[in-house]
C-alpha cells in the first residue's frame, strides 16, 4: 500500500535490496572528453570538478531532451553518464556521430550495477571511490546513497522496495526520462532549469537557443509537478 511505501522511505532500518538494477552507463573518456561533453550537453560540464557529479541532459535542436542522466567525473578525462531510465547503447551510438575529430572515445560501460548503500557522510555533489566503483548521495525525502559498482551478485528485487525507491525519485523531483519519451519534452517542461541542469550562460549546445528563448521570453506550456 502507499502507506507501507511511505513507511519504508522514512524508517532508517529499511533499505532497498542491494542490487537495484543493471546500470545503463555511457563512458566518455579521452583528452577532449570534458570539452566534448560540455559542447553536447545542456549542463555546465566545465564546472564539474573531478570526483563530483551533476544532473544533466542531452537535447535535440528543438530543445527537447533526448535523455536525462547523472554525470560523474571520475577522473580528469573520464566521465560516466548514468541513465536511470535510458539505453546506454542508443545514447552512445548517437553521441558517437558527433565525435568527428575530437580526441574522445564514447562507449557503453559494461558490467556495472546500481547498488543501494547505507546513507553516508559524502557531501552533496561529491563522488567517493569504492573498491568496486563509485558512490554518491541522491536527493530524496530521506538520506540515500547509491553505488555504481562492478561484480554485483544479482538479487531478486522486492517490488515494494523498488516502488519506494521510485517514489523517492518522484518526491525529489528527479525527471528521469524513459527512452520511449525521448525528444518529447523541453528542458523547462522537465524542470531541468530548476535543478541547475540547463545552463543559460555556458555558450552554444544543441537546443540552447530554445532553452534561452523559453527562459527570457516565456512560452513554456508544460511543467513537471507532483500532484499526490
Question: Where do the PLM segments sit?
Answer:
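Basic, glycine/lysine-rich polyanion-binding surfaces/domains
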Residues: 1-228
Amino acid at each position: 500500500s502507499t502507506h507501507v511505501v511511505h513507511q519504508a522511505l522514512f524508517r532508517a532500518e529499511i533499505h532497498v535490496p542491494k542490487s537495484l538494477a543493471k546500470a545503463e552507463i555511457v563512458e566518455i573518456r579521452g583528452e577532449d572528453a570534458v570539452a566534448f561533453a560540455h559542447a553536447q550537453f545542456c549542463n555546465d560540464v566545465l564546472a564539474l570538478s573531478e570526483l563530483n557529479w551533476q544532473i544533466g541532459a542531452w537535447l535535440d535542436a528543438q530543445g527537447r531532451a533526448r535523455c536525462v542522466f547523472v554525470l560523474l567525473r571520475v577522473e580528469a578525462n573520464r566521465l560516466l553518464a548514468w541513465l536511470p531510465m535510458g539505453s546506454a547503447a542508443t545514447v552512445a551510438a548517437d553521441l558517437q556521430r558527433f565525435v568527428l575529430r575530437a580526441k574522445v572515445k564514447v562507449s557503453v560501460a559494461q558490467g556495472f550495477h546500481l547498488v543501494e548503500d547505507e546513507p553516508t557522510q559524502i557531501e552533496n555533489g561529491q563522488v567517493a571511490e569504492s573498491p568496486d566503483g563509485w558512490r554518491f548521495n541522491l536527493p530524496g525525502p530521506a538520506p540515500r546513497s547509491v553505488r555504481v559498482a562492478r561484480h554485483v551478485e544479482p538479487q531478486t528485487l522486492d517490488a515494494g522496495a523498488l516502488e519506494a525507491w521510485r517514489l523517492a525519485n518522484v518526491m525529489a523531483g528527479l525527471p528521469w526520462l524513459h527512452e520511449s519519451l525521448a525528444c518529447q519534452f523541453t528542458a523547462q517542461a522537465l524542470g531541468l532549469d530548476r535543478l541547475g541542469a540547463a545552463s543559460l550562460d555556458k555558450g552554444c549546445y544543441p537546443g540552447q537557443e530554445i532553452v534561452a528563448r523559453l527562459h527570457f521570453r516565456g512560452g513554456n506550456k508544460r511543467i513537471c509537478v507532483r500532484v499526490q
